[in-house]
From Swiss-Prot:
Family, as annotated: Belongs to the elongation factor P family.
Descriptive protein name: Elongation factor P
Protein's pathway: Protein biosynthesis; polypeptide chain elongation
Keywords for this protein: Cytoplasm, Elongation factor, Protein biosynthesis
PROSITE patterns: EFP (PS01275)
Listed CDD domains: S1_EF-P_repeat_1, S1_EF-P_repeat_2
GO MF, any single term: translation elongation factor activity
Cellular compartment(s): Cytoplasm
Chief location: cytoplasm
Record has Amino-acid biosynthesis as a keyword: no
Length: 185
């Protein structure tokens, strides 16, 4: 059991039948009354996010999440296919469940598949990925690193705001947590 006051960002717990992941958690002490925990939560099974409040002493069952390293193979007919790197077992995950993560993943990229018991609940990406720009506005002569930048479409369909000097064919390092351009690869 885990107390609400001990829940941190990234932790997964059970609230009744719902499997919830903490996106953000903060203590809030109103002028009158008791302290409350404000949390932004994600229902792992449905993918929906919502805000909720709990008393610090509320107890929840902490979910044991296991991960295995797997390689993304391909997506077809709304199913993303992955292969366990050790056992070569293949996993099929509905694209709808991992559509945001797939914007950062090329075929043959290693990711971590998360399990709750035998149920696949999602994938965990590496912190950064290298993707190639497939579409962007042409560079402007004299453009510098500073400035507002321009949108660029990556080979996976991800759209990232990049500096003006970036051209089609450039490989860029992208942060998978924020979706931001980091540097040229």
């Amino acid at each position: 059991m885990v107390l609400a006051k001990d829940l941190k960002s990234g932790m997964t717990f059970l609230n009744g039948e719902k499997l919830l992941r903490v996106m953000e958690a903060s203590h809030h002490k109103p002028g009158k009354g008791n302290t409350i925990m404000r949390m932004k939560l994600k229902d792992v099974r449905s993918g929906s996010t919502f805000d909720d409040t709990y008393r610090p002493e509320d107890k929840f069952e902490q979910a044991v999440i296991e991960t295995v390293t797997a390689q993304y193979l391909y997506s077809m007919d709304d199913i993303a296919n992955f292969m366990n790197n050790e056992t070569y077992e293949q996993y099929e995950i509905p694209v709808e469940q991992v559509k945001d993560e797939l914007l950062y993943v090329l075929e043959n990229t290693d990711v971590k598949i998360q399990f709750y018991g035998t149920e696949v609940i999602g994938i965990q990406l590496p912190t950064t990925v290298v993707l190639e720009v497939t579409e962007t506005q042409p560079s402007i002569k004299g453009a510098t690193v500073t400035g507002s930048g321009k949108p660029a479409t990556m080979e996976t369909g991800l759209v990232v705001n990049v500096p003006d000097f970036v051209e089609v064919g450039t490989k860029l390092e992208i942060n998978t947590q924020t979706g931001e351009y980091l540097k040229r690869a």
